[in-house]
Swiss-Prot record:
Domain of life: Bacteria
Annotated PANTHER family: DNA-3-METHYLADENINE GLYCOSYLASE
Gene Ontology molecular function: alkylbase DNA N-glycosylase activity; DNA binding
Protein source organism: Rhizobium johnstonii (strain DSM 114642 / LMG 32736 / 3841) (Rhizobium leguminosarum bv. viciae)
Pfam families assigned to the protein according to its UniProt record, in alphabetical order: Pur_DNA_glyco
Keyword tags: DNA damage, DNA repair, Hydrolase
A single GO BP: base-excision repair
Keyword Manganese: no
EC number, as in UniProt: 3.2.2.-
Protein name in the entry: Putative 3-methyladenine DNA glycosylase
Amino acid sequence: MTDATTNGAIGAGTLTGESLRKFFERDAITVSRDLLGCHLTVDGVGGRITETEAYFPDDEASHSFRGPTKRNGAMYGKPGNVYIYRIYGVYWCLNFVCHPGSAALIRALEPETGIPRMMERRGTDMLTSLCSGPGKLCQALGIDIAINDRLLDRAPYAIAPSAPVPIVSGKRIGITKNAEAPWRFGIQGSRFLSKPFR
């Protein structure tokens, strides 16, 4: 489904301290939309966020649905905290905390900096597939549990907002509960998505 509006991402410069808190201390849908176009780097490797999903504490598809646990503790951190978890026992996934227990999953990114390192880590030189999914993105950026549970203004992370971009929205991917919620968001027309929007 195509969204007729753009997101509200504005400003320039890296988000730190109070600006980081203000950006993320909002509902997960708003944050997920406004993350589109933002520039994310991990140890200098990264690019433009092109696809996100929103999750809430009362959302059966969310890790926080049954409350805090040892595994999801980072999801209850401060706004702008990083929550990393593993799926299928293999792939890492990157999330940013909004309100406690709610988060934005980063699903895809358009590579911009450190591309040779991404290609080496991913074992491919196909630009559009380097970060076209949450697991691929984490592999390309060298993300694992060792850099979980820290704010985005702390090394090795850096994130900067962008001008508004046109967005599309649709159902989230790979879930069976609350699967109809249209809480997946992407940059309209981007070639750097995990899957096309329909």
